[in-house]
Amino acid sequence: MPIGVPKVPYRLAGNEVAEWVDLYNRLYRERVLFLCQDLDDELANQLIGIMLYLNAEDKSKGIYVYINSPGGSVTCGVGVFDAMNYIKSDVTTICVGTAASMASFVLAGGRKGKRLALPHSRIMIHQPEGGSQGQASVVLSESEEVLRIRDEVAQIYSERTGQTLERISRDMNRDQFMSAREAKDYGLVDQIASSVSQ
């Protein structure tokens, strides 16, 4: 039975009385965001919008993105990645379970030195998928676009991890699962965090 989103008390500056707000809104105010479902247009737009707002509010404060996601749309993942690297606020990414497919791309997109995984996290990279059907010309056109995006994603993984483009391309040919330690050795994350204070 779903319990819904819990409510917590929060007092805005200047207010004497705390208001009950949902947990996510409370954490957004502390600059904590979540990528904890399939990454689709709606979630990507929410994350991008909140990051832009928080950056405009105070560029000197960091933003924290907690990730537990099987991935999702390639274009959405690239959009979130670009927004994270566009804003001036440092973005710390933290894998708290699974960061697979485009979620691992977002994880790798955090500020260098501020990409973390909890000790028992699983990270997975693979090549983007296309699902076109219909006329041959449409299928061919989409296949070419998927290959172009695959090359772009592989290049970014290579830049973010320090791995050669050849190795990234080879590893993306199949689902490449990694433990937190393996992801650190690979360069997808910088630290394995065992407590919040890290």
Swiss-Prot record:
Catalyzed chemical reaction(s): Hydrolysis of proteins to small peptides in the presence of ATP and magnesium. alpha-casein is the usual test substrate. In the absence of ATP, only oligopeptides shorter than five residues are hydrolyzed (such as succinyl-Leu-Tyr-|-NHMec, and Leu-Tyr-Leu-|-Tyr-Trp, in which cleavage of the -Tyr-|-Leu- and -Tyr-|-Trp bonds also occurs)
Gene3D superfamilies given in the database record: 2-enoyl-CoA Hydratase, Chain A, domain 1 (3.90.226.10)
Cellular component, GO, one term: endopeptidase Clp complex
EC number: 3.4.21.92
Disulfide bonds: none
Keywords: Chloroplast, Hydrolase, Plastid, Protease, Serine protease
Biological process according to GO: protein quality control for misfolded or incompletely synthesized proteins
Record's subcellular location: Plastid, Chloroplast stroma
Molecular function terms, GO-annotated: ATP-dependent peptidase activity; ATPase binding; serine-type endopeptidase activity
Superkingdom, natural source: Eukaryota
Main localization category: plastid
Active site feature: S101 (nucleophile), H126
Subunit relationships: Component of the chloroplastic Clp protease core complex.
HAMAP family from the UniProt entry: ClpP
Family: Belongs to the peptidase S14 family.
Function: Cleaves peptides in various proteins in a process that requires ATP hydrolysis. Has a chymotrypsin-like activity. Plays a major role in the degradation of misfolded proteins.
This protein's name: ATP-dependent Clp protease proteolytic subunit
Originating organism: Tupiella akineta (Green alga)
Gene: clpP
